[in-house]
């Protein structure tokens, strides 16, 4: 039959969660302590307030609607699973700055609301099924979108632009913002749009919490589209598996490598080959000059210009990628061969894991977008090549 099976599912829920594990409960937390005394013989037990009462703190809550479809066609040679969800989160917990009433300037509170929706799709097909040849395909696609609809916090400009991802009302959770780069001046010093609308090199207030009209929204730091595509081909005793993964929709902050001063021990990246060198170069390049001692003496706070350049819109790349995740080729020897060797089974397999990237942003200059900015002690995603001989008796 054309339609093999069909099932529909739907659910709606209201759930509550205690929030982050590091957030204390709404009651005061009082713990025993041993106050310091000059001599060990004068010790005594006391009590200390570990956390003040936070009576207005309540659970994080979420309304969620889920709709799903699972259908099969042509004797289940084609199987499709589709799920859609919509969520409304409210009373989300975060830090809030207060007037100091109650003894704390900053404390945890229910400060945010967020709406989100997403789609998850899985498609499995048996494309060809013959005696000596088979071909199967498995395709997975996931899309998500969210928006912070209410937020009562005071966040500094520096937090929005560093690249870790901060939330602003009207944008996705974990968004990246940048200073607007306005080109190099005649000396090769970078210039930017200031909050008052003027063009400046050093009048950038990284600790600003109110007027941030000069920031440019770049996008979320988390991908909005993820998935995979796998194909398995079988011909007689051979099996070829080709598996790819993909991710789109996020942005990454390039490494903050520029400074108003360098030492002989500084490793210069390849961007410096295209830097400003002579008057007029500001018309051909966006890479600032290596500031001289005289420029550092004549221009006060010159370090601000280079810090701002690190966090400008020209230092942002797309985090999109398509990766060849795995390629494997195996061969199962015929029973006639293994029986002659007094074996019940014999197979040989070659497998390559993470062999190469099919696509990534050229701004990353070959760096892995999945590994980018994960930290200096993080281990990059390794390339693995294995050859396996399997023998059974």
Regions found by a protein language model. Give the residues of each.
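Extracellular/periplasmic, surface-exposed regions of secreted and cell-surface proteins
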Residues: 1-171, 311-393
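Conserved small-residue
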Residues: 22-24, 109, 126-221, 252, ...
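Short glycine/proline-rich turn/loop motifs
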Residues: 47-49, 208-212, 303-312
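Short, hydrophobic/aromatic alpha-helical segments in well-folded domains
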Residues: 53, 68, 211-213, 226-229
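N-terminal hydrophobic signal/anchor transmembrane helix of membrane proteins
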Residues: 65, 77-81, 225, 249, ...
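A short local loop/turn or secondary-structure capping micro-motif enriched for an aromatic residue
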Residues: 89-90, 200-202, 249-251, 366-368
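Glycine-rich, aromatic-lined ligand/substrate-binding cores of catalytic
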Residues: 218-255
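Extracytoplasmic gating/loop element in the C-terminal half of outer-membrane beta-barrel translocons
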Residues: 248-346
């Amino acid at each position: 039959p054309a339609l093999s099976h069909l099932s529909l599912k739907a659910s709606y829920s209201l759930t509550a969660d205690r929030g982050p594990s590091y957030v204390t409960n709404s009651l005061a937390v009082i713990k025993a302590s041993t106050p310091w005394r000059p001599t060990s013989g004068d010790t005594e037990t006391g009590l200390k307030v570990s956390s003040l009462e936070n009576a207005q703190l309540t659970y994080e809550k979420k309304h969620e609607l889920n709709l799903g479809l699972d259908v099969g066609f042509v004797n289940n040679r084609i199987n499709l699973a589709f799920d859609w969800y919509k969520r409304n989160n409210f009373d989300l917990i975060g830090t809030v700055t207060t007037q100091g009433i109650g003894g704390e300037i900053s404390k945890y509170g229910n400060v945010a609301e967020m709406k989100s929706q997403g789609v998850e799709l899985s498609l499995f097909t048996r494309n060809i099924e013959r005696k000596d040849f088979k071909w199967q395909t498995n395709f997975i696609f996931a899309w998500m979108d969210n928006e912070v609809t209410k937020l009562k916090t005071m966040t500094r400009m520096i937090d929005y632009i560093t690249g870790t991802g901060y939330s602003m009302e009207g944008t996705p959770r974990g968004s990246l913002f940048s200073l607007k780069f306005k080109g190099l001046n005649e000396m090769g010093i970078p210039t930017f749009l200031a909050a008052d609308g003027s063009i400046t090199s050093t009048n950038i207030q990284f600790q600003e919490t109110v007027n941030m009209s000069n920031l440019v929204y770049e996008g979320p730091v988390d991908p909005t589209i993820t998935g995979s595509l796998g194909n398995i081909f079988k011909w007689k005793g051979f099996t070829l598996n080709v598996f790819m993964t993909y991710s789109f929709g996020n942005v990454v902050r390039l490494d903050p490598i520029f400074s108003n001063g360098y030492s002989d021990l500084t490793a210069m990246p390849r961007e410096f080959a295209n830097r400003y060198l002579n008057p007029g170069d500001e018309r051909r390049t966006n890479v600032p000059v290596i500031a001289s001692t005289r420029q550092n003496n004549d221009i006060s706070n010159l370090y601000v210009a280079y810090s701002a350049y690190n966090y400008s819109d020209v230092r942002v790349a797309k985090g999109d990628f398509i990766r060849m995740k795995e390629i494997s080729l195996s061969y199962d020897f015929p029973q006639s061969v293994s029986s002659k060797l007094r074996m019940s089974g014999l197979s040989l397999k070659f497998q390559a894991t993470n062999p190469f990237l099919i696509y990534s942003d050229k701004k990353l200059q070959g760096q892995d977008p999945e590994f980018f900015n994960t930290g200096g002690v993080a281990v990059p995603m390794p390339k693995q090549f294995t050859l396996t001989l399997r023998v059974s008796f």
